Protein backbone atom coordinates (compact mmCIF):
# COMPACT_ATOMS: atom_id res chain seq x y z
CA UNK A 1 0.00 0.00 0.00
CA UNK A 2 2.89 2.34 0.81
CA UNK A 3 4.27 1.64 -2.68
CA UNK A 4 0.89 2.48 -4.21
CA UNK A 5 0.72 5.73 -2.23
CA UNK A 6 4.20 6.73 -3.41
CA UNK A 7 3.32 5.90 -7.01
CA UNK A 8 0.07 7.87 -6.79
CA UNK A 9 1.95 10.94 -5.54
CA UNK A 10 4.51 10.60 -8.36
CA UNK A 11 1.64 10.42 -10.85
CA UNK A 12 0.24 13.73 -9.61
CA UNK A 13 -2.42 12.56 -7.17
CA UNK A 14 -3.37 15.18 -4.60
CA UNK A 15 -6.12 15.48 -2.02
CA UNK A 16 -7.71 18.23 -4.11
CA UNK A 17 -7.83 15.89 -7.11
CA UNK A 18 -9.19 13.07 -4.94
CA UNK A 19 -12.01 15.24 -3.61
CA UNK A 20 -12.76 16.43 -7.17
CA UNK A 21 -13.05 12.77 -8.23
CA UNK A 22 -15.31 11.97 -5.26
CA UNK A 23 -17.56 15.04 -5.37
CA UNK A 24 -20.52 13.19 -6.91
CA UNK A 25 -19.97 9.79 -5.31
CA UNK A 26 -22.96 10.08 -2.98
CA UNK A 27 -25.26 10.16 -6.02
CA UNK A 28 -24.40 6.48 -6.55
CA UNK A 29 -22.89 5.06 -3.36
CA UNK A 30 -24.85 4.81 -0.11
CA UNK A 31 -22.54 2.66 2.03
CA UNK A 32 -20.18 4.33 4.53
CA UNK A 33 -17.01 5.65 2.88
CA UNK A 34 -13.65 5.74 4.63
CA UNK A 35 -10.45 7.27 3.27
CA UNK A 36 -7.01 6.03 4.27
CA UNK A 37 -3.88 8.12 3.99
CA UNK A 38 -0.87 9.53 5.73
CA UNK A 39 -0.88 12.61 7.94
CA UNK A 40 1.59 14.76 5.97
CA UNK A 41 -0.61 15.37 2.88
CA UNK A 42 -3.57 16.03 5.19
CA UNK A 43 -1.54 18.61 7.12
CA UNK A 44 -0.47 20.27 3.86
CA UNK A 45 -4.14 20.49 2.88
CA UNK A 46 -5.00 21.78 6.36
CA UNK A 47 -6.62 19.42 8.86
CA UNK A 48 -9.73 21.53 9.39
CA UNK A 49 -10.21 22.07 5.64
CA UNK A 50 -9.63 18.36 5.07
CA UNK A 51 -12.32 17.37 7.58
CA UNK A 52 -14.74 19.98 6.23
CA UNK A 53 -14.21 18.73 2.66
CA UNK A 54 -14.67 15.13 3.83
CA UNK A 55 -18.02 16.09 5.35
CA UNK A 56 -19.10 18.04 2.26
CA UNK A 57 -18.10 15.12 0.01
CA UNK A 58 -19.88 12.53 2.13
CA UNK A 59 -16.84 10.79 3.59
CA UNK A 60 -17.73 9.15 6.90
CA UNK A 61 -14.32 8.38 8.33
CA UNK A 62 -10.57 8.52 7.85
CA UNK A 63 -7.82 6.07 8.73
CA UNK A 64 -4.53 7.89 9.36
CA UNK A 65 -2.01 5.17 10.31
CA UNK A 66 0.72 7.60 11.36
CA UNK A 67 -1.49 9.79 13.59
CA UNK A 68 -0.55 9.08 17.22
CA UNK A 69 -3.54 8.67 19.53
CA UNK A 70 -2.16 11.30 21.93
CA UNK A 71 -1.94 13.87 19.11
CA UNK A 72 -5.45 12.94 17.97
CA UNK A 73 -6.80 13.58 21.47
CA UNK A 74 -4.90 16.84 22.03
CA UNK A 75 -5.01 18.49 18.60
CA UNK A 76 -7.38 16.86 16.12
CA UNK A 77 -10.33 15.21 17.85
CA UNK A 78 -12.40 18.36 18.36
CA UNK A 79 -11.91 19.43 14.74
CA UNK A 80 -12.93 16.02 13.38
CA UNK A 81 -15.96 15.81 15.68
CA UNK A 82 -17.03 19.35 14.74
CA UNK A 83 -17.12 18.23 11.09
CA UNK A 84 -18.73 14.85 11.95
CA UNK A 85 -15.78 12.90 10.53
CA UNK A 86 -14.72 9.77 12.38
CA UNK A 87 -11.00 9.21 12.81
CA UNK A 88 -10.37 5.47 12.85
CA UNK A 89 -7.52 4.38 15.11
CA UNK A 90 -5.38 1.28 14.69
CA UNK A 91 -4.46 -1.28 17.32
CA UNK A 92 -1.87 -4.07 17.09
CA UNK A 93 -1.14 -7.20 19.14
CA UNK A 94 1.27 -5.03 21.15
CA UNK A 95 -1.28 -2.31 22.03
CA UNK A 96 -2.02 -2.32 25.76
CA UNK A 97 -5.52 -3.02 27.06
CA UNK A 98 -5.53 0.44 28.66
CA UNK A 99 -4.79 2.11 25.29
CA UNK A 100 -7.39 -0.02 23.51
CA UNK A 101 -10.05 1.00 26.03
CA UNK A 102 -9.11 4.68 25.61
CA UNK A 103 -9.35 4.37 21.83
CA UNK A 104 -12.72 2.65 22.18
CA UNK A 105 -13.99 5.37 24.52
CA UNK A 106 -12.81 8.36 22.48
CA UNK A 107 -13.43 7.30 18.87
CA UNK A 108 -16.42 6.22 16.81
CA UNK A 109 -16.93 4.22 13.66
CA UNK A 110 -14.81 1.13 14.15
CA UNK A 111 -11.44 0.02 15.48
CA UNK A 112 -8.91 -1.14 12.89
CA UNK A 113 -7.27 -4.28 14.30
CA UNK A 114 -3.91 -4.75 12.61
CA UNK A 115 -3.38 -8.52 12.42
CA UNK A 116 0.35 -8.22 13.07
CA UNK A 117 3.05 -5.63 13.62
CA UNK A 118 4.69 -6.75 10.36
CA UNK A 119 4.19 -4.97 7.05
CA UNK A 120 1.01 -5.52 5.08
CA UNK A 121 0.77 -8.27 2.50
CA UNK A 122 -0.68 -11.68 1.77
CA UNK A 123 -0.81 -14.51 4.30
CA UNK A 124 -2.16 -18.00 3.69
CA UNK A 125 -3.82 -18.20 7.10
CA UNK A 126 -3.66 -16.63 10.56
CA UNK A 127 -1.67 -18.67 13.07
CA UNK A 128 -2.90 -19.60 16.56
CA UNK A 129 -1.10 -16.63 18.13
CA UNK A 130 -2.93 -14.15 15.88
CA UNK A 131 -6.25 -15.87 16.45
CA UNK A 132 -5.65 -15.66 20.22
CA UNK A 133 -5.09 -11.90 19.79
CA UNK A 134 -8.36 -11.60 17.85
CA UNK A 135 -10.19 -13.49 20.60
CA UNK A 136 -8.55 -11.43 23.37
CA UNK A 137 -9.87 -8.23 21.78
CA UNK A 138 -13.32 -9.77 21.19
CA UNK A 139 -13.46 -10.73 24.88
CA UNK A 140 -12.95 -7.07 25.84
CA UNK A 141 -16.54 -6.35 24.70
CA UNK A 142 -15.63 -3.02 23.14
CA UNK A 143 -18.27 -0.44 22.25
CA UNK A 144 -17.00 0.00 18.68
CA UNK A 145 -17.12 -2.76 16.08
CA UNK A 146 -13.74 -4.17 15.05
CA UNK A 147 -12.38 -4.66 11.55
CA UNK A 148 -9.30 -6.81 10.96
CA UNK A 149 -6.75 -5.83 8.33
CA UNK A 150 -3.22 -6.66 7.12
CA UNK A 151 -2.66 -9.93 5.30
CA UNK A 152 -6.19 -10.72 4.17
CA UNK A 153 -5.92 -12.13 0.67
CA UNK A 154 -7.89 -15.37 0.39
CA UNK A 155 -10.95 -17.24 1.63
CA UNK A 156 -9.21 -18.61 4.75
CA UNK A 157 -7.91 -15.28 6.03
CA UNK A 158 -11.16 -13.51 5.12
CA UNK A 159 -13.32 -16.07 6.94
CA UNK A 160 -11.05 -16.07 10.00
CA UNK A 161 -11.14 -12.26 10.20
CA UNK A 162 -14.90 -12.20 9.73
CA UNK A 163 -15.37 -14.81 12.47
CA UNK A 164 -13.49 -12.65 14.99
CA UNK A 165 -14.65 -9.16 13.97
CA UNK A 166 -17.36 -7.21 12.15
CA UNK A 167 -15.42 -7.58 8.92
CA UNK A 168 -12.13 -7.45 7.08
CA UNK A 169 -10.09 -4.69 5.47
CA UNK A 170 -8.37 -5.70 2.25
CA UNK A 171 -5.77 -3.32 0.86
CA UNK A 172 -2.54 -4.90 -0.37
CA UNK A 173 -4.27 -7.72 -2.27
CA UNK A 174 -6.47 -5.23 -4.12
CA UNK A 175 -3.48 -2.99 -4.94
CA UNK A 176 -1.62 -6.05 -6.30
CA UNK A 177 -4.61 -7.01 -8.44
CA UNK A 178 -4.92 -3.43 -9.73
CA UNK A 179 -1.29 -3.67 -10.87
CA UNK A 180 -1.94 -7.02 -12.56
CA UNK A 181 -5.01 -5.61 -14.33
CA UNK A 182 -3.29 -2.37 -15.44
CA UNK A 183 -5.56 -0.24 -13.27
CA UNK A 184 -8.85 -1.81 -14.42
CA UNK A 185 -10.82 -1.52 -11.16
CA UNK A 186 -13.70 -3.75 -12.29
CA UNK A 187 -11.42 -6.63 -13.26
CA UNK A 188 -9.38 -6.21 -10.07
CA UNK A 189 -12.56 -6.21 -7.94
CA UNK A 190 -13.87 -9.33 -9.72
CA UNK A 191 -10.55 -11.12 -9.13
CA UNK A 192 -10.57 -10.07 -5.48
CA UNK A 193 -14.08 -11.43 -4.94
CA UNK A 194 -13.05 -14.66 -6.66
CA UNK A 195 -9.99 -14.99 -4.37
CA UNK A 196 -12.18 -14.53 -1.30
CA UNK A 197 -14.66 -17.18 -2.42
CA UNK A 198 -12.21 -19.96 -3.37
Predicted regions and their residues:
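Hydrophobic faces of well-ordered beta-strands that scaffold small-molecule active sites
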Residues: 33-37, 62-64, 87-91, 111-113, ...
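Catalytic cores of alpha/beta
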Residues: 95-106, 141, 152-168
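Glycine-rich phosphate-binding active-site loops on the catalytic face of alpha/beta enzymes
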Residues: 57-71, 112-122, 164-184
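Active-site-adjacent beta->alpha loops and helix N-cap segments on the catalytic face
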Residues: 10-25, 43-48, 66-82, 96-101, ...
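Glycine/proline-rich, positively charged
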Residues: 35-66
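Alpha-helix-loop-beta-strand connector modules within alpha/beta enzyme cores
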Residues: 1-34, 78-92, 128-146, 152, ...
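Histidine/lysine/aspartate-rich catalytic loop segments that bind and position anionic ligands
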Residues: 85-121
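Glycine-enriched alpha-helix->loop->beta-strand junction motifs that scaffold or abut catalytic
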Residues: 54-60, 80-87, 105-111, 163-168
